[in-house]
Structure formats: structure tokens, C-alpha cells
């Protein structure tokens, strides 16, 4: 009996200590609007019940306003789509790190890289990698981009007048080929698991496992992960991707042949040779780059094609511009100077990234307390959800028709009139995506060749699009497109 009483007293003391140590969170909860959700799990169950649909945050913002405090598990989460609050977050040195839960989920699948490094380690790594993404380096990849875009032109010829199709699987293959070749060099084309598609399947598996590891972090426990087969799937996919990268690195380090096309690996391995980076550093970095680049590019191009099919007036406007710059059509070569002339295509691309951003959500964590411009005090240890999707549809910024497709939103005069943190397709501040310029050039070049040669249509309505959170944006139902050849 005495033992039981001692145990109960000890449990009460622990509980009181736990609550007292988190008092700053509960004080914040009294000042900021938002739901608590269920005990211990917060809104995690509701998020899973809705199958990760973005609609949950739409409901929260409608009820509680543009900045909401809620809970996932025992973690307080501040969700916002207010540009001024986003500016506070992006410009604060105390909000530069991702949530530790997200970092662990990513690094367990991809290894350590710019996606997960923190503070000084991140600063040093970015400084080392930045020259590889400068303008001249990016433009050196245009021949590779032209070749792979021509592959798309040839591929789509097979679908002409062949009924409605889902283009995303083919675009996934195309974007993965670009990411792998630009990162690892043209030698990847000789790799068996690259040719047979197994490598792409491995990265797709990792893309699905990362958000599961974020929402259900207990699955990263070795024993629980095995029990629910999470660990088996993670290990299989990570092993295959790592083996591919290791094989290419080893061949590059032992080779004296410099005749291949330029690739990031050649520049970055020079940092290994002079001792600036370790072998493990580049293993993780290459995995991070391939993962981040391939999925976002295919999603963006696919979404542009979908919206062009839904809005034929804008598709015709873009075609007229393309026909003027590229009179011949077919498998033409496009230079960077050519792409700079495509202002209508550029507006369509940016409007698509506004309405359907490839990355709908960024997650940070306060390393020290900060005070927001609205006067609210956010203590250390709070998870910050930067809701890009709803920021891009914020009616206070984009007007009453914020949800409508309108490329004129990106006319020069309209861009100048908006707050700087209202459009975030590649993040913002010092953690802006390193490859943003390469991504835009890749997308514009592929879109130019597709839309110059083909006309797309669909019976799927814009209002019926439904969006799902993932590492990258997913559509609940993929619209099917019909392809016709342009004369």
C-alpha cells in the first residue's frame, strides 16, 4: 500500500513538473485563437481522418482567422497565412530551423543535407554549394534540358487523339531523369536501376514515407517501425537510392576522364578532394537534391498543363506567343534568351505556382522566443506552419477572386503592389531554394515545347480540384487530358 502511495505521489510530481515546464505554451494558448483537438494527439487524428486534405486548414482559417494556434500531439503549432507574420518568421534568426520532427523524418530517409542541417552547419554548407547554382552553372545545363524536353515532345505524339490520359507518371519519369543527370552526370543513363525505373520508385516511396514519419513519429522507433512495416519500406527505398549515388560517386572519384557533360557532382566532388566536404556529406546532399528537384518539377509542369486544358483562352494566348518565338515547332532548340521572351508563359507558370504550389507547407520551429509584429509573444519550442497554399489565396492580398485563375496577377504593376511575403513558391529569405532558377528554366523549356506542339483539353472542372498535403502537393483526383497536335 505504501509503495502504491509513493508511486502515485511520484506520478503527480512528474505531472505537475511537466505542466509547469510547459507553462509558456499554455499562456500563449490563452492569447491566440485556435482549437486544442483531442487530448495527447491534438488535431493529428482529424488530419489523418481527412486524409491529409488541405481543407482542414481552410476550415481553421475561416473560423479562427489567418493565424491559428493548435496542437499536434503534445506540440503547440502556430499556423499562419498572413504575409506580415510570415515576414517576421522568415527574417528572424530564431525561426530558421525546421521542426526537429520534420528533420528526423527527412534525414532518416534521405540523409543529412541542406533540407535538414541547422544553424552554422547549414550556413557553411550553403556557402559551399552556392557557386554550383550560380547563373553560368545553371545555363550550362540548357542542352540537357533541351534533349529531355524533346523526349516529351516525342512521347506526347503517342497520345495524340488517343483518349484521355494522366500525364503525371510520364512527367515524373522526365523530371527524375533531369534531376539525376544534372546532379550525377550523364553516366546515370548506364545504371540498371535508373533504366528500369526501380530508382524512381525508391524515391517515390521515400516521398510517401516522409509525411508519415512526420505525422506519426513513433513509427521511426526501430521496433514499432518494424511492427507496422514502415522500417522495412524505408530501409529498402533508402538502400537502393544510396547504392545508386555511392556507385556514381566512387566511379567519379576514381576516374580521370573529364569528357562528360557538366554536372553538379563534378563541382561538388572537387570540395571532397580539397577536404571541404566529406564522403558522407555528399552522399546525403545528392540524395536531398535529387529528391527535392524531381518531384517539384513534374508537379509544377503537370499543374500548368492541367490549367491550360481547363482555360483554353489562356492556352491559345500562350500558343500565339510560342509560335512567334518558335515558328517551326517540332523538336526545336530553345536558348535562355528565347525563354526570356515568353512573358505570357511566364505569367501562366507563376499563376499556377500561386494556386497550386508544389510545396504547400513549410515547417519551422522557434529556437528562441520571438515577438511577432502583431504583438504576440511566441516562446521557444513552438512549431511554425507556414501555409503557402492559403497565403497564395489570401483574399486580403490577392482580392476577392483570389481562388480564380488569372495570370494577370503577375503583370509588373500588380507584382509591385503586393507585399514581399505574399508569394512564396521557392520559400523566402536566406533559405530560398538554391535551385529556383534551374527549376524555372526547366519548367519553361518543357512547357514551351509541349504547348507549341500540342493542344490540351479536359472535361474536369477547375472547381472540382481537391488538394492533399504531402512532402509535395498532391491532387485528390488527377484530371485526365486529351492531346491534339497543333498545325
UniProtKB/Swiss-Prot annotation:
Source organism of this protein record: Drosophila melanogaster
Modified residues (Phosphotyrosine): 223
Protein name (record): Probable cytochrome P450 313a5
Keyword Cell membrane: no
Keyword Nucleotide-binding part of the UniProt annotation: no
Pfam families listed in its UniProt record: p450 (PF00067)
Cofactor(s) essential for the protein: heme
Its membrane topology: Peripheral membrane protein
A GO cellular component entry from the record: endoplasmic reticulum membrane
Similarity comment text for this entry: Belongs to the cytochrome P450 family.
Residues involved in heme binding: 433
Keyword field: Endoplasmic reticulum, Heme, Iron, Membrane, Metal-binding, Microsome, Monooxygenase, Oxidoreductase, Phosphoprotein
Annotated localization: Endoplasmic reticulum membrane; Microsome membrane
Gene symbol of the encoding locus: Cyp313a5
GO molecular function: heme binding; iron ion binding; monooxygenase activity; oxidoreductase activity, acting on paired donors, with incorporation or reduction of molecular oxygen
Transmembrane segments: none
Amino acid at each position: 500500500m505504501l509503495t502504491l502511495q509513493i508511486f502515485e505521489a511520484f506520478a503527480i510530481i512528474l505531472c505537475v513538473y511537466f505542466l509547469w515546464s510547459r507553462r509558456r505554451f499554455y499562456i500563449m494558448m490563452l492569447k491566440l485563437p485556435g482549437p486544442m483537438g483531442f487530448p495527447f494527439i491534438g488535431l493529428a487524428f482529424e488530419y489523418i481522418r481527412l486524409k491529409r486534405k488541405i481543407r482542414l486548414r481552410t476550415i481553421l482559417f475561416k473560423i479562427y482567422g489567418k493565424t491559428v494556434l493548435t496542437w499536434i500531439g503534445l506540440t503547440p503549432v502556430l499556423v499562419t497565412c498572413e504575409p506580415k507574420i510570415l515576414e517576421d518568421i522568415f527574417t528572424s534568426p530564431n525561426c530558421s530551423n525546421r521542426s526537429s520532427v520534420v528533420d528526423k523524418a527527412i534525414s532518416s530517409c534521405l540523409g543529412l543535407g541542406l533540407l535538414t542541417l541547422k544553424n552554422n552547419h547549414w550556413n557553411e554548407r550553403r556557402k559551399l554549394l552556392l557557386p554550383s547554382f550560380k547563373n553560368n552553372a545553371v545555363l550550362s545545363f540548357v542542352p540537357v534540358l533541351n534533349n529531355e524536353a524533346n523526349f516529351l515532345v516525342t512521347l506526347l505524339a503517342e497520345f495524340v487523339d488517343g483518349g484521355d490520359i494522366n500525364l503525371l507518371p510520364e512527367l515524373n519519369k522526365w523530371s527524375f531523369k533531369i534531376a539525376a543527370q544534372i546532379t550525377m552526370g550523364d553516366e546515370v543513363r548506364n545504371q540498371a536501376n535508373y533504366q528500369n525505373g526501380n530508382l524512381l520508385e525508391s524515391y517515390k516511396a521515400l516521398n510517401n514515407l516522409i509525411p508519415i514519419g512526420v505525422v506519426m513519429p513513433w513509427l521511426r522507433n526501430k521496433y514499432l517501425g518494424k511492427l507496422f512495416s514502415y522500417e522495412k519500406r524505408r530501409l529498402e527505398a533508402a538502400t537502393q537510392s544510396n547504392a545508386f549515388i555511392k556507385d556514381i560517386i566512387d566511379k567519379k572519384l576514381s576516374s580521370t576522364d573529364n569528357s562528360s557533360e557538366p554536372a553538379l557532382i563534378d563541382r561538388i566532388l572537387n570540395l571532397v578532394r580539397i577536404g571541404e566536404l566529406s564522403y558522407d556529406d555528399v552522399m546525403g546532399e545528392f540524395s536531398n537534391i535529387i529528391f527535392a528537384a524531381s518531384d517539384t518539377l513534374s508537379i509544377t509542369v503537370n499543374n500548368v498543363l492541367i490549367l491550360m486544358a481547363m482555360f483554353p483562352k489562356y492556352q491559345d494566348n500562350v500558343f500565339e506567343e510560342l509560335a512567334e518565338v518558335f515558328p517551326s515547332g517540332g523538336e526545336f532548340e530553345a536558348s535562355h534568351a528565347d525563354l526570356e521572351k515568353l512573358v505570357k508563359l511566364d505569367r501562366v507558370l507563376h499563376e499556377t505556382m500561386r494556386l497550386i504550389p508544389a510545396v504547400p507547407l513549410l515547417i519551422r520551429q522557434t529556437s528562441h522566443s520571438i515577438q511577432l509584429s502583431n504583438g504576440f509573444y511566441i516562446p521557444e519550442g513552438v512549431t511554425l506552419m507556414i501555409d503557402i497554399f492559403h497565403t497564395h489565396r489570401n483574399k486580403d492580398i490577392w482580392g476577392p477572386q483570389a481562388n480564380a485563375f488569372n495570370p494577370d496577377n503577375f503583370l509588373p504593376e500588380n507584382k509591385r503592389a503586393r507585399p514581399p511575403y505574399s508569394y512564396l513558391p521557392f520559400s523566402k529569405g536566406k533559405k530560398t531554394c538554391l535551385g529556383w532558377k534551374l527549376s524555372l528554366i526547366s519548367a519553361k523549356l518543357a512547357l514551351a515545347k509541349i504547348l507549341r506542339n500540342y493542344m490540351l483539353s479536359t472535361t474536369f472542372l477547375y472547381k472540382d480540384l481537391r488538394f492533399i498535403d504531402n512532402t509535395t502537393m498532391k491532387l485528390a483526383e488527377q484530371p485526365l487530358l486529351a492531346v491534339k497536335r497543333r498545325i
